[in-house]
Amino acid sequence: MVVTNKYVLKWVEEMAALTKPDKIVWLDGSLEEKKKLEDECVASGEMIELNQDILPGCFYHRTAANDVARVEDRTFICSKTKEEAGPTNNWMDPAEMYAKLTPLFDGSMKGRTMYVLPYIMGPAGSPLSKVGVELTDSRYVVLNMRIMTRMGDIAWKQLGDDSEFVKGLHSKADIDADKRYIAHFPQDYTIWSINSGYGGNVILAKKCFALRIASVLAKEQDWMAEHMLILGIENEATGKTQYVTGAFPSACGKTNLAMLIPPAYAKGYKVFTVGDDIAWMRPFPDGHLYAINPENGFFGVAPGTSMESNPNALLTTKSNTIFTNVALTDDKNVWWKGMGVPAPAHMIDWLGKEWNKGDDEKAAAHPNSRFTAPASQCPSISPEWENPQGVPVSAILFGGRRAKTAPLVYQSFDWNHGVFVGATMASETTAAAAGAVGVVRRDPMAMKPFIGYNAGDYFAHWLHMGTLIEKKPLIFNVNWFKTDAEGKFMWPGYGDNFRVLEWVLKRCNNEVDARKTPIGYVPYAKDIDLTGLEGYTEADIENLLTIEKDVWEEEIAGIEKHFAGFDRLPAELENQLQAMKDRFAAV
């Protein structure tokens, strides 16, 4: 289709004049185009075609050894003032950043093709969806974006003649880590990324647009862009499906929870995946908060993904998937540690070097190696995942990895208290052998690296949203990672986390009472269903639900220190902290 949008044409012309590509290709999203790009990638060595008998439509890619993860120290929010970026972001004046990056982009696409990639975040035609255009000199980026977004002519049709689209400019340049920048210009709805070829830095639709820029749009337009999974739980007995969103820092089992398979006792229940990473949420006239998954695929961490830990994720990757920085077997299959399959005698590791049995298995695939897979292939994908209105949210979960502090689950007293629970979220590193508690890392709403503006204003926006949502979701905190005196996990986790979700929904439906404590409402042990869970008694659940005053006094001190780091902390959060102190003082 011929693009006539004058704003797009002018911007592409300006960026091409800067980057000087040999040619410009306007992408249409067709299968023929995909095949041509794949063939070119294989011919150039950018990608390796995997064994099509085992993994049809799958390809393998290695990034540069210095380019394997998001780089928070090279990621900038270039708002007009430093105060607008706030304490959680690196800031540079927008004029200064444009001046710094313009020479780096000058001629960066010489000898290459510039691909013009239009895409939609969210289901086509949804009142919640947004259009972006990414210009890139990387075919690998194009093929990833084909999976992660709804791209091509469908996006041009949705954009029409509108000027409101998010502009993304990406060039691999020469993958120089010292000149690597991922810069966001919220007032221009623009992202510039240079000298990286790694997923999170270059698939600009993902964290850059769907969280950092979208969080700014959400504040301006009274909606929410959150780092959250969305799952649906269907109760066949009632015919009712209820939806839960959840924010978890990394290494807390977010994708596993999004794709959970209920334990055998829970006959008549089904869990559906709407999204595994990002939720865009908006109040609708019926009073409910509705959520969409703006993405079209999963960009998942490969190591540890197995038929035991997350069968739905592994099955999603069996076709039409791009694997990045995993190990490559001699029969052109993929391998990583924790896959549940023994390592073969010989492989090529993620660096392209020989790997032989006896070598370190953890080193075969990079710890942050990835799969990019279409969400539509997920066995647990929700029938509602492309509903343009989204799904109504009954509950919001916050969670982290806490050895001693947080009980298995508790419910906030109300919305504002729930915002306090999310704002004080933390995860800790544990030395498993000694059970020693390590460093506590605060990660508010699991959004610390992704809030596109001042974090204090972000908390204020959460509080403001509470005034707009008539039928507010209940807010809970979960902790699958409580440990005993020996440092062993006290809860089995994985599919058994459904037992906690079941209690959460019973609270949403007003079907069960709870015990009021200084931190919130905690279950009665008898209300967590232990059917079929061998070796667990009500007494074990009691231990998982204990709240130790001395441990929480330490936690309160940690929260005070955390809050001291914000320049625009809403007074309501200080009030919530004081109220919690008062409740503990009364115990």
What are these regions (language model features)?
Residues 1-252, 262-587:
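Conserved internal helical-beta-strand scaffold that buttresses enzyme catalytic cores
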Residues 257:
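Hydrophobic positions on the alpha1 helix immediately C-terminal to the Walker A/P-loop
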